[in-house]
């Protein structure tokens, strides 16, 4: 994240996702962004199916560990895995609009922008937009393939 071109390229995914929703070439209700380069850290199980939730919120992975018995975090990375997002065609434009505004504001202040941390800040400011699941980076796909147990 010390390379300005890398920061711009990573954050450009949201505009590409927005363009996909606008064109809706396959006439679908839900869209997903998946970074295939994430395989260096994310486990890609065979025959795994990602499905959207019943509601229209953005389905995302909150990078943290949660102890259900103690109802406390073992650690909280305060990041959303931006490499895998699933959302409804009506919700994605809201996500991308908020991302654009937040990204441009931080950029104008001269900040180095980590998209995973920016998404977490967006989650804190707009919890109604997200349906998040607590997990580690390695298990993102497996976790988002199962019904969610911790939500906002």
Task: Identify what each model region corresponds to.
Residues 1-25:
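Active-site-proximal specificity loops/subdomain of glycosyltransferases
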Residues 17, 48-50, 119-120:
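Short amphipathic alpha-helical segments and helix-helix/interface helices
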Residues 18-27, 61-81, 86, 92-94:
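A structural preference for long, well-packed, hydrophobic secondary-structure segments
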Residues 23-26, 30, 38-71:
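Conserved donor-nucleotide/metal-binding helix-loop-beta segment in metal-dependent transferases, i.e.
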Residues 38-40, 74-152:
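Catalytic core and acceptor-binding pocket of nucleotide-sugar-dependent glycosyltransferases
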């Amino acid at each position: 994240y010390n390379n300005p071109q890398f920061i711009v390229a990573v954050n450009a995914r949201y505009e590409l996702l927005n363009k996909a929703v606008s064109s809706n070439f396959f006439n679908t209700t839900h869209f997903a962004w998946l970074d295939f380069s994430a395989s260096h850290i994310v486990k890609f199980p065979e025959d795994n199916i990602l499905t959207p939730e019943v509601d229209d919120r953005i389905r995302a992975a909150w990078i943290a560990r949660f102890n259900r018995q103690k109802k406390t975090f073992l650690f909280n990375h305060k990041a959303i895995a931006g490499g895998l997002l699933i959302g409804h065609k009506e919700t994605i434009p809201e996500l991308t609009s908020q991302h654009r505004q937040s990204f441009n504001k931080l950029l104008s202040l001269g900040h180095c922008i980590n998209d995973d941390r920016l998404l977490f800040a967006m989650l804190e400011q707009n919890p109604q937009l997200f349906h998040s699941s607590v997990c580690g980076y390695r298990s993102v796909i497996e976790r988002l393939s199962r019904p969610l147990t911790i939500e906002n």
